[in-house]
Amino acid sequence: MQVSVESTSALERRMTVGVPVERIETEVNKRLQQTARRAKVPGFRPGKVPMSVIRQRYEDAARQEALGDLIQATFYEAVVEQKLNPAGAPAVEPKSFEKGKDLEYVATFEVFPEFEVTGFDSIAIERLQADVADSDVDNMLDILRKQNTRFEAVERAAENGDQLNIDFVGKIDGEAFAGGSAKGTQLVLGSGRMIPGFEDALVGVKAGEERVINPTFPEDYQNLDLAGKTAEFAVTVNSVSAPQLPELNDEFFALFGIKEGGLEGFRAEVRKNMERELRQAIKSKVKNQVMDGLLAANPVEVPKALIGNEVNRLRVQAVQQFGGNIKPDQLPAELFEEQAKRRVVLGLIVAEVVKQFDLKPDEARVRELIEEMASAYQEPEQVVAWYYKNDQQMNEVRSVVLEEQVVDTVLQKANVTDKAVSYEDAVKPAEAPKAD
């Protein structure tokens, strides 16, 4: 087999492969012999058909099959021989395909980039330091109580924070419009759910009252037919209800699965969850900075095939997440290209760090991560056992741990500054990383 390789760009290779006619004929004959054993030809017993008849009837098909299989087999033999690492399937162009002659074809494909990850000392990391204070737990209890607010009917004028049950009919220039009317709508005043001016105009109403209000749709309203127009809404108030925060008692604690320990036990459980959230938030922000730093220090050209594959994965995820009667390939590729490129580049960089530093998943950390995830469930021991019985889930956890070890490796070499902040600042969502 003869092989020659031409570099047509930084990552594209044009490989010419020549396959001797003897190898072709061996493969063709092998297939004809297999066919002869099972072929049914009128006038002959199975397995007794003369080879001349077999050739006449089946040689063309056997040759096409043999050539296709040989191209696939010799391509992989050639890339191994040439020490190439294809990043996707090749585009194959036959050059010589005649019977009785050598097969020659050209395979064009991209290869994975070869590079070394550098610039660790140029990466600046701000690592947040925070604790869960008693006041943070108090604030969380207030949030949990507000999330479980109940509304009770009152015989007074409505205030911000009250919940109204209303019917309304909206018109513009005396004409009703789509979506402008509803019955039995629950509306919390001050929630910002309705267009500006709607909720403010209902402050002070009482149950049974009818009121006409005239709010204006914003100029940037999504329905362009309504944008910037003033509407008239005839509103009937069916009821006014005031918010009632639940008491911190056993009934409230039971909503969160806490059946014993009283307030002290509930606070301890809330604190434990907050501490877990804090650790995860700090870890996530450090990881984002590490990845951004690796990207900035290591500009890597990536194969278009890998970006295309990642774009397709993101399309499928988008359809699964948002639903709708749409096929993934109907979503414009450009919507996902920047995110896809970032993922591909980071995947290559992380894999190279693993290779450079000979990293392997720390099984103790794998166990620790599984136990931490399991602690959020009612029966953590069962969750841990489930992970260890599921190879796919275990591999995913090991991948997460290996990525954490990459982050730790970078932190040992980067410029790290610790910064003390409040719990609230530490758990604020990090800004989305910029796509490179």
Swiss-Prot record:
<dbReference type="GO" id="GO:0051083">
    <property type="term" value="P:'de novo' cotranslational protein folding"/>
</dbReference>
<dbReference type="GO" id="GO:0044183">
    <property type="term" value="F:protein folding chaperone"/>
</dbReference>
<dbReference type="Pfam" id="PF05697">
    <property type="entry name" value="Trigger_N"/>
</dbReference>
<dbReference type="InterPro" id="IPR008881">
    <property type="entry name" value="Trigger_fac_ribosome-bd_bac"/>
</dbReference>
<dbReference type="GO" id="GO:0003755">
    <property type="term" value="F:peptidyl-prolyl cis-trans isomerase activity"/>
</dbReference>
<dbReference type="Pfam" id="PF05698">
    <property type="entry name" value="Trigger_C"/>
</dbReference>
<dbReference type="GO" id="GO:0005737">
    <property type="term" value="C:cytoplasm"/>
</dbReference>
<dbReference type="GO" id="GO:0015031">
    <property type="term" value="P:protein transport"/>
</dbReference>
<keyword id="KW-0143">Chaperone</keyword>
<dbReference type="InterPro" id="IPR027304">
    <property type="entry name" value="Trigger_fact/SurA_dom_sf"/>
</dbReference>
<dbReference type="GO" id="GO:0043335">
    <property type="term" value="P:protein unfolding"/>
</dbReference>
<dbReference type="GO" id="GO:0043022">
    <property type="term" value="F:ribosome binding"/>
</dbReference>
<keyword id="KW-0697">Rotamase</keyword>
<dbReference type="InterPro" id="IPR005215">
    <property type="entry name" value="Trig_fac"/>
</dbReference>
<keyword id="KW-0132">Cell division</keyword>
<dbReference type="InterPro" id="IPR037041">
    <property type="entry name" value="Trigger_fac_C_sf"/>
</dbReference>
<comment type="function">
    <text>Involved in protein export. Acts as a chaperone by maintaining the newly synthesized protein in an open conformation. Functions as a peptidyl-prolyl cis-trans isomerase.</text>
</comment>
<dbReference type="InterPro" id="IPR046357">
    <property type="entry name" value="PPIase_dom_sf"/>
</dbReference>
<keyword id="KW-0131">Cell cycle</keyword>
<keyword id="KW-0963">Cytoplasm</keyword>
<feature type="domain" description="PPIase FKBP-type">
    <location>
        <begin position="161"/>
        <end position="246"/>
    </location>
</feature>
<keyword id="KW-0413">Isomerase</keyword>
<dbReference type="InterPro" id="IPR008880">
    <property type="entry name" value="Trigger_fac_C"/>
</dbReference>
<protein>
    <recommendedName>
        <fullName>Trigger factor</fullName>
        <ecNumber>5.2.1.8</ecNumber>
    </recommendedName>
</protein>
<dbReference type="GO" id="GO:0051301">
    <property type="term" value="P:cell division"/>
</dbReference>
<dbReference type="InterPro" id="IPR001179">
    <property type="entry name" value="PPIase_FKBP_dom"/>
</dbReference>
<dbReference type="InterPro" id="IPR036611">
    <property type="entry name" value="Trigger_fac_ribosome-bd_sf"/>
</dbReference>
<dbReference type="GO" id="GO:0061077">
    <property type="term" value="P:chaperone-mediated protein folding"/>
</dbReference>
<dbReference type="Pfam" id="PF00254">
    <property type="entry name" value="FKBP_C"/>
</dbReference>
<comment type="similarity">
    <text>Belongs to the FKBP-type PPIase family. Tig subfamily.</text>
</comment>
